[in-house]
């Protein structure tokens, strides 16, 4: 089993069915359903995901999708310590700094999946695009 931290953009791709990105994102969630991956997302992602989903879904539909998401993933806490580290980090994007510092708190994490790999250049964790992660998971399943 692989332990994967998903950046917010990947979750939005999946839930909002943003083509062409949703295909790889859906495959990642399928690996989770099959027990081949455990997916982590940060708690702070929920408000960002809700905001984006509300642009194309009713509030009730967006809440339903977030509830389903909570059943498919592990949610990492965003603590004061994570915020402080993120504020002092070398990351250019504050939200990415929060995501990264949340991932660092996990005892088991194989990689972070994001479409914004350039924003994670300072990462000490492995960073993959959704397509790279899908390829790795497909090859490790054989």
Where are these regions (language model features)?
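Short, well-structured N-terminal submotif of metal-dependent ribonuclease cores
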Residues: 1-41, 54-61, 122, 132-142
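A short, flexible beta-alpha/helix-coil linker loop
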Residues: 11-12, 46, 83, 119
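Active-site-proximal, substrate-binding regions of enzyme catalytic domains
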Residues: 26, 44-82
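Hydrophobic helix-cap positions at the C-terminus of alpha-helices
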Residues: 31-32, 69, 106
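Active-site neighborhoods of divalent-metal-dependent phosphate/nucleic-acid chemistry enzymes
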Residues: 74-117
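Short loop/helix-cap segments at secondary-structure boundaries that form the rim of catalytic
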Residues: 118-125
């Amino acid at each position: 089993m692989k332990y994967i931290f998903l950046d917010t953009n990947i979750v939005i791709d999946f839930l909002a069915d943003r083509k062409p990105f949703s295909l790889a994102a859906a495959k990642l969630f399928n690996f989770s359903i099959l027990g081949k991956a455990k997916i982590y997302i940060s708690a702070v992602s929920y408000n960002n995901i809700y905001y984006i989903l509300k642009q194309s879904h009713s509030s009730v539909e967006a809440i339903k999708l977030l509830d389903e998401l909570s059943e498919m993933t592990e949610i990492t806490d965003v603590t004061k310590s994570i915020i402080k580290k993120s504020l002092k980090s070398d990351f250019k994007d504050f939200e990415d700094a929060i995501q990264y510092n949340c991932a660092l708190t996990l005892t088991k994490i194989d990689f972070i999946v994001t479409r914004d790999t350039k924003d994670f250049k300072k990462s000490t964790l492995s960073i993959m695009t959704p397509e790279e992660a899908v390829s790795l998971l497909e090859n490790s399943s054989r």
